[in-house]
């Protein structure tokens, strides 16, 4: 028997049909496997009861590509955070965020993150490696399995910078759409901005939402918060965003984490409105998503008072900027990106398998 496409998770319907034929099976076995992989969420080929028993036994050593849940924490608002252990022992986080009408998954794209944003728990842990296709898809299947309902929305806002793993992330977006059945317009990719990558993304013919993490209205402050911003001037980033919106026809969401006394003053709101004016005047559609900070032990930043948040909103609206405030979920369960992994490693008496 020839080697299968490994891992199986991440393979397209056509590839699975071809593989089944290579194994001497009818092509419809590949269709069945596709259904069991992406819609039933199997963790072992032994679960595919529609396969002949002899073939199941021959396939028993073939890994599907699922990760192990090593920790699950549910917050009072129903948000569930998962710590997943990959085949090499690395640890990543994913979050399931339910509401009455939707189930959103916040997925990671890297183990750690090289961007080193100084208010972010993931940025404090350093960078280990890019995630593989099956490791991204597995996060969505894990949440579906746990909640017992279909995932409707996916946001690439977990650990890592998606555009530094761009090819695999775009593969994952297409698979989420074609294999799992999540509409591209229900998928959001968040980036702090990587030179030349937003223009590249604009050429990929996707219908996703792009969320750009600004976090500051001027270059000096942005470099203090996001060291990598030194290599991507704010004016150039905004220009690339404007071109992306005009090319794709899709609205961009500008993410802005409010840090008490750091970037939440009235002058910052006015600077932000002025910064975005150059994009909106060109006919581009944009939206600002304000995120009151979720404090972490590794950084000395605080959450702003609600009255400060309300004033920031008022000033942006006064300058005709569309704005909303994100409802922060999972505050009681270390739901900020990177917190669960960090606390788990600190509490572990020995390193996770595969780690030095």
Curated annotation (Swiss-Prot):
Q: Which residues form the signal peptide?
A: none
Q: Which cofactor does it need?
A: [4Fe-4S] cluster
Its annotated compartments are: Cytoplasm
Give an example GO molecular function. Answer: metal ion binding
Broadest EC class assigned to this enzyme: transferase
Residue numbers binding S-adenosyl-L-methionine: 160-161, 190, 213-215, 294
GO biological process per UniProt = rRNA base methylation; tRNA methylation
Q: Which residue ranges does the record assign to the Radical SAM core domain? A: 99-332
A Gene Ontology term for the protein's cellular component: cytoplasm
Q: Write down the CDD domains for this protein, in alphabetical order.
A: Radical_SAM
EC number(s) of the enzyme?
2.1.1.192
Instruction: Determine if Coiled coil is one of this entry's keywords.
Output: no
Task: Write the record's keywords in alphabetical order, separated by commas.
Answer: 4Fe-4S, Cytoplasm, Disulfide bond, Iron, Iron-sulfur, Metal-binding, Methyltransferase, rRNA processing, S-adenosyl-L-methionine, Transferase, tRNA processing
Stated family: Belongs to the radical SAM superfamily. RlmN family.
| Classification via HAMAP family | RNA_methyltr_RlmN (MF_01849)
**NCBIfam families given in the database record:** rRNA_mod_RlmN
Described function: Specifically methylates position 2 of adenine 2503 in 23S rRNA and position 2 of adenine 37 in tRNAs.
Instruction: Add the further remark from the entry.
Output: Reaction proceeds by a ping-pong mechanism involving intermediate methylation of a conserved cysteine residue.
- What's the protein called, per UniProt? Probable dual-specificity RNA methyltransferase RlmN
Species in which this protein is naturally found: Synechococcus sp. (strain JA-3-3Ab) (Cyanobacteria bacterium Yellowstone A-Prime)
The gene is rlmN
């Amino acid at each position: 028997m020839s080697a299968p496409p490994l891992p199986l998770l991440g393979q397209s319907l056509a590839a699975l049909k071809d593989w089944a034929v290579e194994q001497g099976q009818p092509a419809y076995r590949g269709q069945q496997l596709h259904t069991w992989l992406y819609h039933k969420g199997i963790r072992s080929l032994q679960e595919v009861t529609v396969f002949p028993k002899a073939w199941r036994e021959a396939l028993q050593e073939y890994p599907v590509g699922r990760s192990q849940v090593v920790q699950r924490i549910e917050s009072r608002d129903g948000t569930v955070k998962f710590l997943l252990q990959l085949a090499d022992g690395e640890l990543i986080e994913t979050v399931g965020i339910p509401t009455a009408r939707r189930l959103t998954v916040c997925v990671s794209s890297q183990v750690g993150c090289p961007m080193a944003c100084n208010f972010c728990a993931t940025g404090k842990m350093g960078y280990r490696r890019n995630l593989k296709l099956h490791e991204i898809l597995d996060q969505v299947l894990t949440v579906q399995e746990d909640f017992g309902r279909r995932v409707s929305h996916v946001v690439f806002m977990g650990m890592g910078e998606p555009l530094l793993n761009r090819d695999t992330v775009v593969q994952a977006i297409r698979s989420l759409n074609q294999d799992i059945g999540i509409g591209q317009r229900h998928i959001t990719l968040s980036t702090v901005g990587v030179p030349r990558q937003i223009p590249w993304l604009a050429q990929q013919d996707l219908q996703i939402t792009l969320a750009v993490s600004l976090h500051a209205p001027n270059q000096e402050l942005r470099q203090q918060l996001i060291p990598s911003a030194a290599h991507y001037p704010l004016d150039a980033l905004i220009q690339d965003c404007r071109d992306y919106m005009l090319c794709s026809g899709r609205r961009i969401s500008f993410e802005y984490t409010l840090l008490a006394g750091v970037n939440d003053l009235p002058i910052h709101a006015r600077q932000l409105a002025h910064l975005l004016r150059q994009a909106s005047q060109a006919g581009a559609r944009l939206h600002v998503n304000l995120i009151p900070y979720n404090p972490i032990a590794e950084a000395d930043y605080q959450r702003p008072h609600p009255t400060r948040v309300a004033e920031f909103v008022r000033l942006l609206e006064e300058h005709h900027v569309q704005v909303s405030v994100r409802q922060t979920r999972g505050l009681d369960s270390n739901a900020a990106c990177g917190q669960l992994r960090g606390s788990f490693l600190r509490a572990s008496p020995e390193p996770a398998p595969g780690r030095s």
